[in-house]
């Protein structure tokens, strides 16, 4: 299936019925759909990824007024060698952000934080990475509420449920897209239209063109 097939046969939805469309992509959530798209290859690490440029191509089929992408980046560690894992992750995350901007997304980004994690007895058990954009996405949706008729949300995070309910009370339509096994029941029930993303895997696969392209991340996130 290519984009023309998608437009002709699997149409996401008819944009004429949804007025002015704003798209909000929670890319940290969307990126993990790769584990559902290609479970064998991504059992432990991300060996297959979602292509941000192809993602933009699919989104553009519904002729959005604006499209936003939210994604955190690792900090550069100038005191460490360039081939250190942290610097590799930094370059990979910046590469994705640059690609999103070149693909027409308005990008919201910030540093990924590492937080000490302790067990119930107060024993240090490691560090966890944290970088969610719930507040930023909510603020963008609320501040721009008069500029759109429909929110097209790319996420399965149940944390958006209350926000989307509020938007519906303001006569906004909600379209949510997510892999079936990543989608929360709350988002399914409050959406005017829920679209399973699973049939899009072939359209969204990232295929490096040459060796100069940053390698696929071996993160076990």
Sequence positions of predicted segments:
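Nuclease catalytic cores that cleave nucleic-acid phosphodiester bonds
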Residues: 94-221
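Domain-level signal for Mg2+-assisted phosphodiester chemistry and nucleotide/NA-binding surfaces
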Residues: 2-128, 173, 178, 182
